[in-house]
């Protein structure tokens, strides 16, 4: 991705500023304890260990806009309904010349999403500067924090530094977390401070946290002063560095956590900060190489990069929560699929498949909830698939089963992986379809069929009969399951019942004669009406009722722009949701305006929010918004819809120079480049997710090319249809087809 113009944003009269050196680099600067409005600590995470850091590279225990601070470790729970266990937070003390500095005089904080690394630069008086570099390692549960002390002029004596690991769960006094017991000890042979712990929570957890440094240190083994300290003597032009390593392992991660900790100790001592960071960056290099976009809108690109970073840092070994902090890291199948779609369309399909694999693994529990008459997944799934939600009418949601099926099916559409379809996707899809058929489809005396009374979207209230959103999801589940069965060569009378149910549900979709509505008799506006186009592509773009419904919601979007009846704006994940729906129509102007509206609400570190408007702010680092945004921007550039691939379909006409590399359905990749308003490259090649590819029809707007620009090999495949050049593409092994 290209370098972007440096962008300065004045935040307040006290010279705070946010800088953008590239779409990956997010920097803010300030003085003292003066933070910019709506500052949220940036996130470093590897999907297990999740930590937000402040401007000194430490942590405060304060909750802002429902942001969660402290060291979190996904999967370690106090109870089924309770929070994740608290693993404390990091503090420090810096002193020299007889003064201890609680806060720096000046500070700069940078989150580099390219390398998943944080850099803080702090000035303490006029003589000392401290640079902090931090990674949460992508492959290991290791946190590495390097402090570099620089003397700006001769110091009056040594600098005393202490890294303190505060295990307290309270900001106003020392109090150990509930049901957690710690035993710190200094291991002189290993030169490490090892903290063994036992936690009695949802499971019984036993583990070890080890602190060590790459320089001689003094250890404080007391629980209230736990940490490592040392004195350093930097001179002008001769900085001194020390790296603190924090190693985590427990019985949920491995059967022998003590051995894993020893392996980690050997690794950090052999590699040091630079070696660990290089290994870490190689993993992130691979992730960033999967999809590439270069677009002329700097803010859209920055939000895109931030969205992918957010999705990758919250990709747990189980699946994708709305964030490891929000909602205690539980897994909503609805939000999980939003994350899935963002990862899938950005070509991170090996990571994306964790969602359908998680649902396959927890399928036995989902079936047990219906006495084996279909799969009913928990509303807020724990890591074992069991329910983590408190009682409420949200338990009457059922559309999340169609989200589960959608992710499972979409993974096959992208990869063309028959083994995956047979072993993972189809069993999940079939049981979700059985659930809808046997539990939720109501047959009426006149032969019609509707979905029973359920909670559709929470803002619409409970007990809505024949809801549009849920009905479209059921239709898509039925129809995609039947398609999967045909691909696998399976025959069963049950599949005929699925097809029949889908056909009958189509006939009873609620409408007012002009447009589809959320449920019969509904008088309020709701985003529910866009779902027949996205995320469930069950309706044709020629369906006038759906088109009018989507445009009506677009026109009235600020009347129902949040999941909850709060605020007066359009939340970013709704904006991206509508943009995805409108991308199916090639509506460039509206899609672009919605993407810009979503992107305008990201934070200083490109984080996406659940809500971020003038008077309401909720849940920063909200992965649902990140997933919706990434997928929506991908769809404006390359829209996949069953057997059709639309190239630059909703890309703004005013964009004259841009390029992208994105995955296509059928296990293919499109590498596209537009220069001076003309297509100069469109290479279709086989992707790497399976050994085969499926033929697809590619559509390219005619304003981007002429017949003379079409490649000789592609010319026989070309057909001109209604303002588009149409190419039917089927690739052999190793083949790349250049349409230009």
Predicted regions and their residues:
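Non-catalytic C-terminal accessory modules of carbohydrate-active enzymes
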Residues: 22-148, 588-739
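Active-site core of glycosidic bond-cleaving carbohydrate-active enzymes
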Residues: 329-365, 397-418, 423, 467-641
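Structured mid-domain segments that build the active-site/substrate or prosthetic-cofactor binding neighborhood
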Residues: 245, 410, 429, 434-439, ...
């Amino acid at each position: 991705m290209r370098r972007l113009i440096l962008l300065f944003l004045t935040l307040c009269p006290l010279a705070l500023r946010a800088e953008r050196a590239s779409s990956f680099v997010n920097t803010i600067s300030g003085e003292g304890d003066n933070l910019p409005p709506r500052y949220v600590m940036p996130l470093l995470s590897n999907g297990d260990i999740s930590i937000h850091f402040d401007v000194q590279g430490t942590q405060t225990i304060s909750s802002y806009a429902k942001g969660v601070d402290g060291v979190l470790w996904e999967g370690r729970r106090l109870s089924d309904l309770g929070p994740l266990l608290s693993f404390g937070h990091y503090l420090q003390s810096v002193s020299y010349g007889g003064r201890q500095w609680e806060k720096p005089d000046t500070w700069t904080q940078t989150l580099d999403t390219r390398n998943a690394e944080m850099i803080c630069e702090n000035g303490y008086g006029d003589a000392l500067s401290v640079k902090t570099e931090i990674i949460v390692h992508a492959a290991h549960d290791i946190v590495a924090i390097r402090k570099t002390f620089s003397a700006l002029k001769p110091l009056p004596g040594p600098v005393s530094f202490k890294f303190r690991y505060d295990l307290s769960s309270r900001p106003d006094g020392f109090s150990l977390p509930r049901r957690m017991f710690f035993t710190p000890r200094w291991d002189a042979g290993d030169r490490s401070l090892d903290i063994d712990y036992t936690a009695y929570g949802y499971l019984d957890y036993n583990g070890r946290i080890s602190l060590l440094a790459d320089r001689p240190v003094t250890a404080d083994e007391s629980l209230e002063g736990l940490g490592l300290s040392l004195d350093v003597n930097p001179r002008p032009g001769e900085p001194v560095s020390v790296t603190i390593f924090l190693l985590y392992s427990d019985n949920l991660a491995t059967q022998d956590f003590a051995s894993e900790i020893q392996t980690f100790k050997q690794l950090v001592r052999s590699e040091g900060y630079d070696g660990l960071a290089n290994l870490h960056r190689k993993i992130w290099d691979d992730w960033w190489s999967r999809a590439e976009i270069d677009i002329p809108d700097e803010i859209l690109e920055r939000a895109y990069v931030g969205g992918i970073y957010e999705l990758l840092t919250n990709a747990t070994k189980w699946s994708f929560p709305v964030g490891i902090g929000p909602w205690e890291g539980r897994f909503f199948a609805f939000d999980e699929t939003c994350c899935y779609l963002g990862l899938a369309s950005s070509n991170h399909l090996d990571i994306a498949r964790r969602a359908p694999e998680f649902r396959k693994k927890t399928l036995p529990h989902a079936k047990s909830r219906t006495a084996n008459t279909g799969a009913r997944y928990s509303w807020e799934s724990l890591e074992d698939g069991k329910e983590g939600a408190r009682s409420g009418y949200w338990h009457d949601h059922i559309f999340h089963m169609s989200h589960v099926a959608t992710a499972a099916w979409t993974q096959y559409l992208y990869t063309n992986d028959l083994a995956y379809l047979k072993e993972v996707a189809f069993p999940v899809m079939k049981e979700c379809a059985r659930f809808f058929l046997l539990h939720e489809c109501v047959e009426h005396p006149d032969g019609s069929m509707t979905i029973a009374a359920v909670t559709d979207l929470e803002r619409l209230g409970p007990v809505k009969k024949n809801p549009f959103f849920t009905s479209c999801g059921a239709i898509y589940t039925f129809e995609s399951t039947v398609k999967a069965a045909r691909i696998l060569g399976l025959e069963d009378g049950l599949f005929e019942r699925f097809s029949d149910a889908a056909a009958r549900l189509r006939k009873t979709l609620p409408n007012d004669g002009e447009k589809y509505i959320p449920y019969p008799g509904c008088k309020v506006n709701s985003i529910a009406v866009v779902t027949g186009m996205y995320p469930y592509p069950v309706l044709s773009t020629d369906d006038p009722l759906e088109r009018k419904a989507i445009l009506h919601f677009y026109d009235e979007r600020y009347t129902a722009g949040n999941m909850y009846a709060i605020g007066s704006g359009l939340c970013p994940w709704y904006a991206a949701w509508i943009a995805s729906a409108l991308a199916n129509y090639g509506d460039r102007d509206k899609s672009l305006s919605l993407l810009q509206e979503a992107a305008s609400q990201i934070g200083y570190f490109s984080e996406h929010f659940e809500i971020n408007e003038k008077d309401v702010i909720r849940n920063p680092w909200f992965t649902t918004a990140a997933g919706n945004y990434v997928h929506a921007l991908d769809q404006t550039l390359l829209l996949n819809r069953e057997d059709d691939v639309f190239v630059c379909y909703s890309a703004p006409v005013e964009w004259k120079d841009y390029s992208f590399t994105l995955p296509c359905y059928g296990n293919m990749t499109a590498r596209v480049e537009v220069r001076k308003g003309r297509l100069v490259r469109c290479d279709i090649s086989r992707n790497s997710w399976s050994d085969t590819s499926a033929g697809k029809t590619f559509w390219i707007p005619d304003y981007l090319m002429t017949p003379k620009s079409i490649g000789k090999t592609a010319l026989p495949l070309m057909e001109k249809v209604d303002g588009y050049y149409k190419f039917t593409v089927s690739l052999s092994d190793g083949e790349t087809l250049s349409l230009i």
